[in-house]
Amino acid sequence: MKYDKFSLRKKYLSKRKKYSLRVKKFNFDMIFKLIKKKFSNKKITIAGYYPSNYEVNILSFLKSAEKKNFKIVLPVIGVSNKMTYKSWAFMEPLYVSQFGTLEPKKTNKEIIPDLIIVPLVAYDHNLNRIGYGKGFYDRNLQKISKIKKNIVSVGMAYSFQECPTIPISKYDFKLNYIFTEQGIIKPN
């Protein structure tokens, strides 16, 4: 049976709400190993997200990354629903956005990251993803990949969010990697 994105989004959001609290441990060392492999010892800028709606909680990873002197940025949705990344230190206050997500101050410095961590609603083994349906990450990744050729995109999901096939359109941006509690999905 073939599903459209709307149906898949609804199904996997429900699954995530139901099962996410059962997953106890994520091994974020895998991301640090990827960073070392891709960027050597360069102190890169990492774009994370503040988890909501049962997304994978990456806060311990962001805190560890900050302690290792990586710059941390979080997404901010601005004028015309354009997504940028603003600097954020772990203990700085965050503010509720128009979409109910937490963001750094809009006056914080805008930085283009080297590695972008993307929350996922669903994914397939071909590194396709479904998000919340607004296209923020797809548009943003398209734009940044033209500016920074070696940008690395990493999806974060639970293994139960895997879908046999994700329907794709010309606007969808394929990820470089997907991390789950069971390991890493790499390009074939």
Kindly give the residue locations of the regions a language model identified:
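N-terminal active-site beta-alpha-beta segment that forms phosphate/nucleotide-binding
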Residues: 1-96, 101-104, 108-111
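Surface-exposed, charge/polar-rich loops and edge strands
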Residues: 1-3, 17, 108-116, 125-128, ...
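Internal, well-ordered alpha-helical segments in soluble enzyme and binding-protein domains
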Residues: 8, 31, 136-140, 174
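A residue-level signal for conserved active-site and pocket-lining positions in enzyme catalytic cores
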Residues: 12, 48, 72, 117, ...
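Short, well-ordered alpha-helical microsegments
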Residues: 55-58, 137, 163
